[in-house]
Amino acid sequence: MASQLNRPLLSVSNLLLLVATIFLAILLWQLRGLLVTLMIAVVLAAAIAPIVNIAERWRFPRWLAVIGVYLTLVAGLTGVGLLVGPTLIAQIETLVRILPLYIDNLFGLVEQFALKLGITESEIEQFFDLQALTGWIIRSGQQLLVSSYDITTGILGGIFNLILAFLLSGYMVAGRENLISGLVNLFPQPWSDRLAEQVEPIARRMGGYIQGRVLVSAILSVAITIGLGILGLSEFALALGAIAGFTNLIPFLGPILGVIPALVVAISQGGWTFLWVLLLFIVVQNLETYVLDPLLVGSSVQVHPLYQLLAVLGGTQVLGILGAVIVPPWIAGASVLLENLYLRPKLLAEGKVSREPGVGSRESICSNW
């Protein structure tokens, strides 16, 4: 008993482990910009790996396939930029300049509608402070942009980090075997073999998600641009379509963010234009939800919607808009580890899934969490 009482509550080894953990956490926080770049690189690598694998099956060297894929991407993006870039930039500049006037016009219409309902101006100011609401919207948008801006150290730093992410992703895909072998060998047996088996399904799920999401957003952007042009908003159609397409990369919240600028512009053109634009977005969003997402994204993210929403909110809180885009595919990849290394063994032990191939599929496993 006396020896137990005299025993130190915190051993030297535990103290060293605690200090090392704190030091590692501080180091990771200081290197968060590099970590974000690595996160982007992994997502990009997972997205292009299937294309490289196809080229490799056609007897192309893997390094040559990686270079070919990137040259094709750069050529495509350059062509699109030269084709629509000047018009898009001009429309965005005009939209940024004139949008505050449209917002003031919108609030004026709201006040007029409230007065028709018998609500006095003093009651409007008391319960619905439009000026404070406008300020909150502007500040919230600035905070989101500043979060992403700080992480990437400004615009030039962001461009540099994006280029670095592309280069790193190319290296990851080209040297996949050596890289994976080096990482999993850091873990003792049998975990090294178990983790090596999870690399392919993780890459497939992350890559499938980002490929589908980018393709769906591109289709949505083109559809909205064409629709707004037909409805008489050709002056801002390209900019509003690009905004809607980019924000659509963000699950759940993105479609809502994308429709707001278009509706603000539309209502200044009249009530009928507003209704037609609203109908356009409703049709396009339903087409995405019931046709494009099941067809192109499918079940690549087999995670409960609540967890996906929390991933978006958490990513936005830490990394701004950038986090809302890159965190969900990481959650999708992490779900593979959770399913295969914890949920499936647990359900097998409980007899709820079968060991036979094809029985106890991922869908049935995912439905348990």
Q: What are the residue ranges of the model-derived segments?
A:
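Hydrophobic alpha-helical transmembrane segments of membrane transport and translocation systems
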Residues: F274-S354
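Alpha-helical transmembrane segments of multipass membrane proteins
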Residues: I22-L27, V74, T78, L168-S169, ...
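Membrane-interface starts of transmembrane alpha-helices
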Residues: P61-V69, Q126, L130, S192-L195, ...
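Alpha-helical transmembrane segments and their immediate interhelical loop/hinge regions
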Residues: S13, I151-I267, G271-L279
